[in-house]
Amino acid sequence: MNLKKFFNTPTHEPFRDKKAERNLFARRTLVAFLGILLLTGVLFTNIYQLQIVNFDTYQTRSNGNRIKLLPLPPTRGLIYDRYGKLLAENLTFFGLYIVPEKTENLDRTLDELRYIVGLTDNDIENFKKERRRGTRYTPILLKPNLTEEQISRFAVNGYQYPSLEVRPYFKRHYLYGETMAHILGYVGKMNDKDVERLKREDKFANYAGTNDIGKLGIERYYEDILQGTTGFEEVEINNRGKVIRTLRSRPAVAGKSIHLTIDLALQRYITELLSGLKGAVVVLDPKDSSVLAMVSTPSYDNNLFVDGISSEDYKRLLNDLARPLYSRATQGAYPPASTVKPFIAVAAQTENVITPNTTIFDPGYWVLPNSTKRFRDWKKTGHGDTDLNKAITESSDTYFYQVAYNMGIDRLSNWMKDFGFGMPTGIEIQEETAANIPTREWKQKRYKRPWVQGDTISVGIGQGYWTATPLQVAKATTILVNNGKVNTPHLMKAIEGAVLEPYEDPLLYPDINTPKVAAWEAAKRGMYNVVNAANGTGRKAFADANYRVAGKSGTAQVFSLKENEKYNTAGLKKELHDHAWFTAYAPYDNPKLVVTVILENAGGGSSNAAPLARKVMDYYLNQRLPQVEKYNVPIQQKKDLSQESEQINGR
């Protein structure tokens, strides 16, 4: 045994200071109590701030998490022809909508939906574009045009995707596709430029809940009328984003429907006539320049663009050498050729350059004064002694070379601008070129070269630097018919509403005021003889017509010949052949239509374009117009047409 360890082990507890321990405990208790009191004070202060001071703020935030404002897109206005025939409608489809911000794994979800609803790469690409432009927590169309099978498959699997929902939506549909494409244009998905423009014009809010906007044609020009006004629903949602109840709403206001001046039956008839050809036909009512028909071929199906055209289809249209996307009626710029001789005749008489009796000898060419340069007439042997009437009737180039030389380019170009050349016509289609009426300033700016007299001579027969669209030639013809009265070519007949709103001419351009009424009559008499005189260039095409016609042919050269070079069509590529023109009006004493025809690379105007114009006039004056006048149907303001309207439209 270790005695030292035994004796050193204490046998009792050390002394404790009870008072000190009590004081320490009291201090700790006080600190703890003060801490609890402080924290309780902070807690109640925050509760006071939340419940009393900032009650409105946090209530708004709370409501924002469970109350949403859902846009109600309006139904787009319909489009009818002049007799109430439906041209553009809205069809109901079902689409799969997604709220990306409420989707846990977006990439995985998109991948899984490929198998459930047939989601394609194109669908995903369109969705991503819309997401970049859209507002957060707003449903975005992911998969359009769902089939019944796809809807059923999603119904089975939908519980896995609380942020997705199948909803109905309206989709634009064009009933006559290629026949009306260049007039109606189409609606398509908004792009960044559209969004920027809408925001700049303070219209973007009205497009909440819709991705469609008018892109071309009438759909674009009358977008504000057709679009309507977006409504809204204030709804309460649960934690899964599902609507529990609707708190209040403001219904959307549907877009207004519009009636065009187009006669669908005439439009379809002309489309059939132009089948397989490259060209255009414009038909105007000379009383007010309303467009009865405007056809450009080849054309395209505008329904392809509504949901976003596929890259394959778009490449096919772009690479088509026949250029189906290009409206030859409003964008085709061709030398107007001899169709302009009657207009020049009016100008030259008014400027006292010629009178109806002014006569020159036409040997088949014209020589520029103080020069050896010859300008050839289309008729190699010439026309002999030629006055104004004969010059128009036989289309003497030599006569109008002399007229152009005497007038000079300044007066000539100014007058042709009065007839509407070198500027937009004012029609409600933005896809229109101004073409070109040349001036000294234009050539200097374009080619850095001064104007020379030889340039003026070519302009005198509608060649050289002068280009025009078929619509411009048709407009100029109506101005001639009306002795200088200028009406704007237009496609709008009326807008539906509480009261039908008829079209009002914006009067973009002034009338041609000339005291010489005889100048107009002399030009029109020449056009009458083109078709009716034995020596008229268009006589053959209108032989035995049961109505009186006045017209003018034109043959537009695609390239210039050298002085002694002969024109040989057999050795030329098709695209180098002349363009065929013909513009006419009928009946002569009481005009009811103006018809202008251009056929690309078809050859002479009198032998190719004039017969087609004859068919159009025969159909309209002998068949269509009597049918319309018999029923005399007013514009229909309802979608379901009357029996008479159905009969008028050939159904």
From Swiss-Prot:
Keywords: Carboxypeptidase, Cell inner membrane, Cell membrane, Cell shape, Cell wall biogenesis/degradation, Hydrolase, Membrane, Peptidoglycan synthesis, Protease, Transmembrane, Transmembrane helix. It catalyses: Preferential cleavage: (Ac)2-L-Lys-D-Ala-|-D-Ala. Also transpeptidation of peptidyl-alanyl moieties that are N-acyl substituents of D-alanine. The keyword rRNA processing does not apply. Its main location: membrane. It is a single-pass membrane protein. The chain crosses the membrane at residues 30-50. NCBIfam families: pbp2_mrdA. Belongs to the transpeptidase family. MrdA subfamily. This is Peptidoglycan D,D-transpeptidase MrdA.
